A protein has these predicted regions:
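Proteins with a high burden of low-complexity, intrinsically disordered sequence enriched in S/T/G/P/A and R
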Residues: 3, 12-13, 28-33, 50, ...
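Well-ordered mid-protein domain cores that form the structural environment of catalytic cofactors
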Residues: 33-87
Length: 348
């Protein structure tokens, strides 16, 4: 968060969607609306199951109305492609659309941090990375050595960031070039564990960790990603069910320990009761559980995310997280965004 770091994100799934009806198909597969989306831009998108629960997330990049590239989570890459194929063949066989995995056709590097624009300008010195010429969530193809690469301005850390897609044959040379061009900035290579911490500080979810198959976009504070004027998409009808819109559903919140020297364990129950040494005939009411928890060196205390029943109404209140030996840790319920809530850093 002070200079820059680089991550090898090649394992993320990448799917190419083509055809005369590609735009219609993408609009049906994801909650967002892509109808007015400009070419060479990307959009963070949610995919739901028929039950309205979050199935996957990723970035949808529009090359034109008949050509899209979407990213998926690593673990769901194959299932998302199968999900698309199933609906294309059984539900909408009249759509002129086809898709294929291009995950192994590109290595992907994620450069992130306040110095990332300077480093990108050194590595690709013929490209203008200014805000005017390269705004947030835009992308373009460029020549690099004797091949073509794609650069997308996006961030999963909350900092100014870029995703670089390069053929595997040129990946090592480009990786080395980043470090040669940034010696005075001490560019740091980082892995998925660090990425998990950085995204949690920003309140970004990981599907499968902060979701469990029973979570809707509204539960995750992501209702802004639902196209309000869309006639249909997978899961749309389910989102109107009475059980789905109850305020008492489990909702994503942030947790901060009252005692900043203490940590919070993932998977532990969140409760209202401090004293757990009660008779078994008085069972403790479990409000939810901790989905993600890390010690933040940037904030110098633990930060956690949790799914809590009626969580939005509990923001600002004090609850307790169970630990071993019938002990508890007092926590404050906060918005699930611990760093830069106004998103100023990634818009630099």
């Amino acid at each position: 968060r002070k200079t820059a770091g680089i991550l090898d994100g090649s394992t993320l799934g990448k799917i190419e969607i083509k055809g005369k009806d590609a735009l219609t198909f993408v609009n049906l597969m994801y909650t967002n609306s892509f109808t007015k989306m400009k070419p060479k831009t990307g959009r963070y998108a949610l995919m739901l199951g028929e039950d309205g629960m979050v199935k996957d997330d990723g970035i949808v990049c529009k090359i034109n109305d008949q050509h899209f590239i979407v990213t998926t989570t690593t673990g769901n890459a194959a299932s998302v492609l199968a999900h698309m194929e199933e609906y294309a063949q059984t539900e909408w066989p009249n759509l002129n659309v086809y898709m294929n995995s291009i995950t192994e056709q590109f290595a992907t590097f994620n450069l992130s941090g306040p110095k990332s624009r300077v480093i990108m300008s050194r590595v690709f010195n013929d490209i203008d990375f200014s805000n005017d010429q390269f705004p947030f969530m835009s992308f373009n193809n460029f020549k690099y050595l004797d091949t073509e690469i794609r650069i997308l301005r996006a961030s999963f850390t909350g900092e100014l960031g870029y995703e670089i897609y390069v053929p595997p044959s040129h990946a090592l040379k480009l990786w080395q070039r980043f470090f040669i061009s940034s010696r005075d900035f001490d560019l740091v290579p980082y892995g998925t564990e660090t990425m998990h911490l950085l995204r949690a500080e920003k309140g970004y979810i990981i599907v499968g960790q902060d979701t469990d198959g029973t979570v809707t976009p509204v539960d995750l504070n992501l209702n802004w990603m639902i196209g309000k004027k869309k006639k249909d998409f997978i899961g749309k009808r389910s989102l109107t069910r009475s059980d789905i819109i109850k305020e008492s559903r489990k909702q994503l919140v942030g947790l901060v320990p009252i005692d900043k020297t203490l940590g919070i364990e993932e998977g532990q129950h969140v409760i209202e009761q401090k004293d757990l040494s009660l008779p078994i005939k008085n069972p403790v009411d479990m409000l939810g559980h901790v989905t993600s928890s890390y010690f933040s060196p940037n904030l110098n205390h633990a930060v956690a995310m949790a799914l809590i029943r009626g969580g939005k109404r509990k923001i600002g209140s004090r609850l307790f997280v169970s630990t071993e030996n019938l002990n508890t840790i007092a926590v404050e319920v906060v918005e699930p965004n611990f760093i830069d809530p106004k998103n100023e850093r990634m818009m630099l």
